[in-house]
Amino acid sequence: MTQLLVTTTENIPGHPYEVIGEVFGLTTQSKNLVRNIGAGLKGLVGGEIKDYTKMLEESRDVAVNRLRDNASAMGADAVVMMRFDTGSISQDMQSVAAYGTAVRFITEDLTTDNA
């Protein structure tokens, strides 16, 4: 089985489609206390907080996978105009939403009636 196509563009060359509707995938992640202390110390001296960067990357992956699952359940062939939205719930919790438009490919009838 092929993986459902997710794109940030509005058009998919060679694939006309009909809109099914909006679709999204959500996740909220947090790091453990020990890592939060380490991140707090890193925040004092500056620089990238790699644990939080990794958490956000993992959160985006989870959100996109849930987006794909939800679109598939709607009967979609693809999701167009996919975007991310992120927000902090607390100092150590981050939510990520992946959202877009679920679409179904239109198969054009190429047969002609010469009768």
From Swiss-Prot:
Pfam family, one: YbjQ_1
Entry-linked InterPro entries: UPF0145_dom_sf, UPF0145_YbjQ-like
Residues making up the signal peptide according to the UniProt record: none
Homology family: Belongs to the UPF0145 family.
Protein name: UPF0145 protein lp_2083
Species this protein is from: Lactiplantibacillus plantarum (strain ATCC BAA-793 / NCIMB 8826 / WCFS1) (Lactobacillus plantarum)
Higher taxonomy: Bacteria, Bacillati, Bacillota, Bacilli, Lactobacillales
